[in-house]
UniProtKB/Swiss-Prot annotation:
Organism: Dictyostelium discoideum (Social amoeba)
Gene for this chain: atg4-1
Native organism taxonomy: Eukaryota, Amoebozoa, Evosea, Eumycetozoa, Dictyostelia
Keywords tagged on the record: Autophagy, Cytoplasm, Hydrolase, Protease, Protein transport, Thiol protease, Transport, Ubl conjugation pathway
Catalytic residues (positions): C262, D562, H564
Role summary: Cysteine protease that plays a key role in autophagy by mediating both proteolytic activation and delipidation of ATG8 family proteins. The protease activity is required for proteolytic activation of ATG8 family proteins: cleaves the C-terminal amino acid of ATG8 proteins to reveal a C-terminal glycine. Exposure of the glycine at the C-terminus is essential for ATG8 proteins conjugation to phosphatidylethanolamine (PE) and insertion to membranes, which is necessary for autophagy. In addition to the protease activity, also mediates delipidation of PE-conjugated ATG8 proteins.
Segments of skewed composition (Low complexity): 29-42, 52-64, 194-215, 439-477, 688-719
Keyword Zinc among UniProt keywords: no
Domain of life (superkingdom): Eukaryota
Pfam families per the UniProt record, alphabetical: Peptidase_C54 (PF03416)
Family indicated by similarity: Belongs to the peptidase C54 family.
GO term, biological process aspect, one: aggrephagy
Acidic residues composition-biased segments: 734-745
InterPro entries xref list: Papain-like_cys_pep_sf, Peptidase_C54, Peptidase_C54_cat
The name this protein goes by in its record: Cysteine protease atg4
Enzyme category, top tier: hydrolase
Length: 745
């Protein structure tokens, strides 16, 4: 019925018994313990009875034995009490283990159910992708023939295609490209061949042809050559569309961009057009012979845009998605830093950054299939160009639709770039000296001698800065205040010596919003004028959730290339790789159907081309409702970031940079537990956080003010820095500079 306690095994835990049996066993154990406690009391009563026969015959030896029995019984009672306490502790322990096991079982069941739901969702997504890949082209009914063109001139990014009757009216145009040789487009048409749509398109084309017989007396001779020349030039342009079965994007199972990559593809098209104009100076409409060469510049450009996760394919979909995630990560990181600084200034503690960072990184990974806006893709491409380190090409994305000429001069003029690096070197040296001053101040404060070293070092530093003073540069103040401990990350001498002394070519992408919900009709004529400019690259935009690459116009119809066509992913080393990126059939739509959000592109080969673009834009702006403005100087409140590498545009970064630049006098707002990536300059400084430093420094400064003159005090406290350029910090949430971006592959 009951098993006694053993030092080796203990009481039986009763886990194998039913609940009632377990309670009965516990009750029996407690009853046995009560009986054992009452037993010594009965024995003592027997010895103490006065009439007992043993009491009369007791001796000293018997009393000693009786005392020993009392001690033994007391020890037995203590042991029993300890055994009871240990038994109760074991019961509590077993109950806790049982609860933990139950919670673990529930957690495993929950994870299993979540995994099943995830698998079902993945199966649904994969099935949806396969269905979309199989029927998307049929659903879109991609045309197999070009649209009908009227006898009016056709404009294609500064080129005019017109009939013989209109030549006399367009001789003054230097960009006119007459076409006299008809060209067959069987190859391009064969890509989109569809039996169902082919007959319908042929019938519609024949009906339109019969209806216009009376108006084609003169045009029948010249229009086929004009249209064929225009279509031939369009077919030679690089065309990107949806792809399927490419290698999965990092940390995902996504192998196609159907439904979400149209803006990404149009951004690739306008950038590829700029690169072709940059590499082919004489004729940017690359002939077919050049396109077939395996080691030509054309093949090199196509390799840059291949959909494979490799560093060689710098403008591929994997790199663009990776850059987008890096930008989102950077924005979230700056937000966390801003929240931490605000909470510390208010007297609060540090936030739980680790958990928030993990949750936000999961959200970033889930946003791979997010549709990009024109502004976003423009800034992503700009940073990819910057990462490629092309020595003779820059990209500029203004934030307010204004081109600042002095800023472009600093960006594209290599002599100014040389001075720019010299200024940065001087500022870095100056900041290191100021940091050493602050460290010496802290040591002297601890030794109760804070005055002498600070004054002499600061004076020497200010004199060195006066001797090495450089002309002002429009570099944002936050960047000048950063300190880089690892100088091996950038070799100034090598970079400066490798820069050729000439003007860099320039790609300009200007994001615009030309209306609220739909395009304002007053801007249509301005868009036509911009498409006529010789520096034009067209513009990207389109309808809501549908992006197109607009390359020209005729009358009130805008001509565009459509990326909504699914093709197989092709290995860049295959023989027919280039064929899948050409042969696009242009389409037309009314200007009134355009979405107001778009991004206009220009390419300037040299300084003369840039000045010509500014002059032409100034003439266009003389009319009402200007779209793009040109200014000579960058205003003080404006910050442009194309000159600055590793610069994060946020109020927190600027505040922390100013704190470091001021010798750490305000780094009470910088917590010790701020954990950021290795690229953040806060980690490089390793600033110790001591909330008492501020008070000690203030007391020491007050003592110095009483002993020294005001001039010396001002010289100690005020470092000699360039004037602050911005009076307020604009919001660059869509234009974040990335300092922790690494290429995929």
């Amino acid at each position: 019925m009951f098993t006694k306690y053993s030092h080796h095994n203990g009481y039986q835990d009763g886990s194998h018994l039913q609940p009632f049996q377990y309670q009965q066993q516990t009750y029996n154990q407690q009853s046995y313990l009560r009986q054992q406690q009452q037993a010594p009391q009965q024995i003592s009563y027997g010895f103490n009875q006065p009439n007992s026969p043993t009491s009369s015959s007791s001796t000293p030896s018997s009393s000693t034995a009786m005392g020993n029995s009392f001690q033994n019984q007391r020890q037995i009672n203590l042991q029993q009490q300890q055994q009871q306490e240990q038994f109760l502790q074991e019961q509590v322990f077993y109950q806790q283990q049982l609860l933990q096991q139950q919670s673990q079982i529930k957690e495993q069941q929950r994870q299993k159910e979540q995994k099943q739901k995830t698998n079902i969702l993945n199966i649904y997504k994969e099935g949806k992708q396969k269905i979309m890949m199989s029927f998307y082209n049929l659903y879109r009914n991609y045309p197999t023939e070009p649209p009908h063109f009227s006898p009016s001139p056709i404009w294609l990014m500064g080129r005019c295609y017109t009939s013989k009757d209109n030549n006399s009216n367009n001789n003054s145009n230097n960009n006119q490209v007459p076409q006299t040789q008809p060209t067959q487009l069987q190859q391009s048409i064969g890509i989109f061949q569809n039996n169902n749509s082919n007959s319908n398109n042929n019938n519609n084309h024949n009906n339109n042809h019969n209806n216009n017989n009376n108006n084609l007396t003169t045009d029948l001779i010249y229009r086929p050559a004009i249209e064929s020349g225009f279509l031939s030039d369009v077919a030679s342009m690089i065309w990107f569309s949806y792809r399927k079965d490419f290698p999965p994007i990092e940390n995902t199972n996504i192998t196609t961009d159907i439904g979400w990559g149209c803006m990404l593809r149009t951004g690739q098209m306008i950038l590829a057009r700029a690169l072709i104009k940059h590499l082919y100076k004489e004729n940017d409409m690359v002939p077919e012979i050049e396109r077939k060469k395996p080691h030509s510049n054309y093949s090199q450009v196509l390799a840059w845009f291949s959909d494979y996760p490799s560093k060689e394919h710098v403008y591929g979909i994997h790199q663009i998605v990776n850059k987008k995630q890096a930008m989102e990560k950077n924005n979230r990181k700056q937000q966390i830093l801003r929240e931490q600084v605000i909470s510390l200034n208010r007297g609060g503690g540090g936030s739980s950054k680790g958990k928030k960072k993990k949750e936000k990184e999961e959200e970033i990974n889930d946003n791979v299939e997010e549709w990009l806006a024109p502004t976003r893709i423009s800034n992503i491409l700009r940073q990819l160009i910057k990462f490629q380190h092309l020595e003779d090409l820059e990209m500029y994305v203004p934030t307010d639709g204004v081109i600042y000429k002095d800023y472009i001069n600093n960006l594209c003029n290599n002599s100014n770039t040389h001075n720019h690096y010299q200024i940065i070197q001087q500022q870095l040296q100056h900041l290191r000296e100021q940091q050493n001053i602050q460290q010496n101040n802290n040591k002297n404060n601890n030794n109760n001698n804070p005055t002498t070293t600070t004054t002499t070092t600061t004076t020497a530093t200010s004199s060195n800065n006066n001797n090495n003073q450089s002309p002002p540069s429009r570099v944002p103040n936050g960047y000048n205040n950063q300190v880089f401990d690892d100088e091996s990350l950038f070799d100034y001498n090598t970079a400066i010596s490798s820069i050729p002394p000439k003007w860099k070519s320039l790609i300009i992408m200007i994001p615009l919003k030309l209306g609220a919900d739909k395009l304002n009709s007053t801007y249509i004529e301005k868009l036509k004028l911009l498409l006529k400019l010789p520096q034009s690259l067209g513009f990207i935009g389109g309808k809501p959730k549908q992006s197109f690459y607009f390359i020209g116009f005729q009358d009130d119809q805008v001509i565009y290339l459509d990326p909504h066509f699914v093709q197989e992913s092709v290995n860049p080393n295959s023989f027919d790789y280039s064929n899948t990126y050409s042969g696009c059939i242009p389409q037309k739509m009314p200007f009134t159907q355009l979405d107001p959000s778009l991004s206009i592109g220009f390419y300037c080969r040299d300084q003369a081309s840039f000045e010509d673009l500014c002059d032409r834009l100034s003439v266009i702006n003389n009319c009402e409702f200007p779209i793009i403005s040109v200014c000579q100087k960058l205003p003080d409140y404006q910050i442009e970031c194309e000159l600055v590498d590793d610069y994060a545009e946020s109020e927190t970064t600027e505040m922390l940079a100013i704190t470091i630049a001021n010798g750490g006098n305000n780094h009470s707002c910088i917590p010790e537990n701020i954990v950021v990536d290795d690229e953040e300059f806060i980690v490089h400084h390793h600033i110790p956080y001591n909330p008492n430093n501020n008070q000690n420094n203030n007391q020491n400064n007050n003592n110095n003010n009483n002993k020294n003159n005001n001039n010396n005090t001002n010289q100690q406290q005020t470092p000699n820095y360039p004037p602050k350029l911005n009076t307020y910090q604009p919001d660059f949430s869509s234009d974040g500079e990335i300092d922790d971006f690494t290429m995929v592959g």
